[in-house]
Amino acid sequence: MKVTEYYTVRHLLAATCSLACVALLAIGANAGLDLRAPEAAKTVFTQETGSAIQLALIIGNGNYPDAAEPLSQPINDASGLAYAMRRHGFDVDMVEDATKADMTRAVERLKSRIKPGSVVMLFFGGYGVQSRQETYMMPTDAVIWKEGDVRQEGMSVETVLHAIKERGARATLAVIDASRRNPYERRFRSFSHGLAPVSAPSNALIISSNTPGKVADDTKGQHSVLVTELLNNLNAHASAEGVFNKTRVAVFRASNGAQMPSVSSSLLEDVHLNPGDDPDLTTSSIAPITTENADDPSPTSPLGHPGHP
């Protein structure tokens, strides 16, 4: 073989080996990515993936100008429940000390995200007032001097629940912690204590902090008795109706019989607050907490703060 031919063959062999090495490195890199991808997918589902499946609007109102002093528990209750519901896969919008405009915007945000098949939770903590056998959630800027003001200034629980139903929600859950003795009760003769029975739309489950017409004064704890017992029972492997009924009994016992929450259900199927217990909620449709935020109890809402559209 000539010297020139020898060097040509040698160069070709070297080039071939180099290309083979590059190919092997590329295959190895892709294999590494493929191995990591499934694990990453377990912890980095986007919240958009589950936004139409489990939604919660949580409102905590504590600073009412007409009250002798602020309510400390509703905001603590809202923060604690928001954190717990995020841990259960809910996409949570929490608002604190909401005015009527804030509450209206929050409900509109919620309605815009509901799709057929959604499970939706509504929580309200603060002052509630009944008028004409209907319960109204009071915003912090409510000005109440006569019964007509309640309907004008407040937000009807039933109206919100029916709006959720009309958007195609699979099921609606409501926790109304508003049976407190409120600062408006002596301003008009026709005032009725406590909350009115809530007329639930179909496929809804509602728990109120006390029997209709009865008041429930706040305790000295960080959370109200209702929210304390609800948080204690959320991890039970039971349907939402089972959780609410367990909470009802626990509140009655914790208050030594002074407080008996009212539970109303028109559910047509089992709904579970633990995603793993619900066959209709697969891991691909749950909005989980990402790894970097899993230990952060911050109540910051991904949907914005009060006053933000």
Task: Give the residues covered by each predicted segment.
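Cysteine endopeptidase catalytic domains of the caspase/legumain-like
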Residues: 2-309
